[in-house]
């Protein structure tokens, strides 16, 4: 996988970006041949705010094609493999100390999976508290600009720098709401979701048990609860994500920008050949699925139903968070993915752990190999809780 280096030197306040975030002095490819060598005319709002806060961009790390895969294995540059396991480029750079933090676009949970397996802290904020202006659109109703670092304190510092209202983002929340999300506080009651705990292997269960023990020792009450509906978030999110992705990548037709096929007869053949040659297998699979979802025949019985499930999931979680401060859940099913053992569509199964946060827009913090899901605007509290794990 490529790492695009820039002029600034890495240092104590150096941040790595993933390749879904636009930068005017570096290529932005979204891990796809379709955007090979694409240069943006402007920086993303998150990049502008990082610079204003005194952070430097140490470079850009490649991502899986449009950020929908497990850890980046679908990138046009190929998977990044370490000791026979697939690893995430941005997470590895932070882990090696070459950057203080990684600022990434979390589309389908890859940022959180990477942090869990690398032993980093990662925060996916409440939807709308960080501007998405200047990010490559994939699944707009759930994707969030996220932060990963070695400590909760570093995550909070970088998140504070990029959070805030932005008039250029129509989904951006008010300044007061953005600030309230960063406020600390004590969470005294946490629940473990039995249905998700049963879907992971022994190593992940050991991480959950260790986190529960640490929280209990710190005076936090930990209980097990049953939430049968929570696994429905995966199916609903896959429907919404692929439908939105299908719509967003329709702009790449070989005419205005992006890859263009050389030999074609007519406009239709230009579209077909350009997309066939430039899109990868996983993205094509998602496009086909999304197209079928948005068809006249399936729109009401599939897409509309997924929107209804989203509302039910949000209502269920709000009810849970009226009693508990956070849910303690796995972030992955296993602590490593073998380079030769990952199915093409495994990302649509593995996201059962990350989909609840994606579809609900609620914040999630990964630490110690586990995930903490909280109510909207509770990321400050979740990061404080993470320090106890």
Regions found by a protein language model. Give the residues of each.
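Short glycine/serine-rich loop segments
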Residues: 43-44, 51-162, 360-368
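A short helix-breaking turn/cap at a secondary-structure junction
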Residues: 3-10, 124-206
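Short, well-ordered beta-strand elements within core beta-sheets of diverse protein domains
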Residues: 34-38, 143-150, 291-295, 372
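Glycine-rich, small-residue loops and helix-cap segments
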Residues: 43, 52, 162, 222, ...
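Generic secondary-structure signature for well-ordered alpha-helical cores
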Residues: 55, 125-128, 150-154, 160-168, ...
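Short acidic, glycine/serine/threonine-rich loops at helix termini
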Residues: 27-28, 68-72, 112-118, 134-135, ...
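Short, well-ordered alpha-helical
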Residues: 1-44, 49-51, 62-69, 171-183, ...
């Amino acid at each position: 996988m490529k790492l695009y280096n820039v002029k600034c030197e890495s240092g104590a306040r150096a941040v790595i970006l993933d390749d879904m975030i636009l930068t005017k002095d570096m290529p932005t490819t979204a891990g796809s041949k379709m955007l090979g060598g694409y240069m943006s005319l402007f920086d993303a709002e998150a990049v502008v705010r990082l610079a204003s806060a005194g952070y430097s961009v140490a470079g850009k790390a490649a991502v899986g094609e449009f950020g929908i895969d497990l850890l980046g294995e679908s990138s046009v540059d190929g998977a990044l493999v370490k000791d026979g396991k697939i690893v995430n480029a941005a997470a590895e750079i932070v882990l090696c100390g070459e950057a203080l933090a990684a600022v990434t676009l979390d589309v389908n949970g890859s940022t959180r999976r990477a942090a869990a397996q690398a032993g980093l802290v990662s925060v996916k904020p409440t939807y709308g508290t960080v501007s998405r202006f200047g990010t490559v659109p994939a699944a707009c109703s759930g994707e969030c600009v996220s932060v990963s670092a070695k400590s909760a304190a570093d995550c909070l510092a970088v998140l504070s720098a990029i959070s805030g209202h932005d008039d250029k983002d129509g989904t951006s929340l008010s300044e007061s709401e953005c600030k309230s999300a960063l406020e600390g506080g004590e969470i005294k009651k946490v629940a473990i979701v039995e249905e998700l705990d049963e879907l992971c292997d022994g190593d992940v269960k050991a991480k959950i048990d260790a986190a529960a023990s640490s929280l209990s020792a710190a005076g936090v009450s930990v209980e097990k609860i049953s939430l049968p509906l929570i696994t429905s978030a995966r199916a609903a999110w896959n429907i919404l994500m692929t439908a939105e992705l299908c719509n967003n990548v329709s702009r790449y037709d070989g005419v205005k920008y992006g890859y263009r096929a050389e030999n074609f007869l007519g406009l239709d053949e230009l579209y077909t050949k350009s997309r066939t040659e430039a899109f990868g297998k996983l993205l094509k699979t998602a496009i086909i699925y999304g197209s079928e979802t948005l068809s006249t025949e399936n729109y009401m019985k599939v897409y509309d139903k997924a929107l209804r499930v989203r509302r039910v999931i949000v209502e269920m979680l709000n009810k849970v968070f009226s009693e508990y401060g956070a849910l303690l859940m796995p972030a992955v099913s296993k602590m490593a993915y073998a380079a030769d053992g990952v199915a093409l569509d495994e990302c649509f199964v593995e996201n059962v752990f990350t989909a609840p946060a994606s579809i609900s827009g609620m914040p999630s913090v990964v630490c110690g190999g586990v995930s903490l899901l909280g109510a909207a605007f509770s990321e400050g509290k979740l990061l404080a809780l993470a320090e106890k794990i």
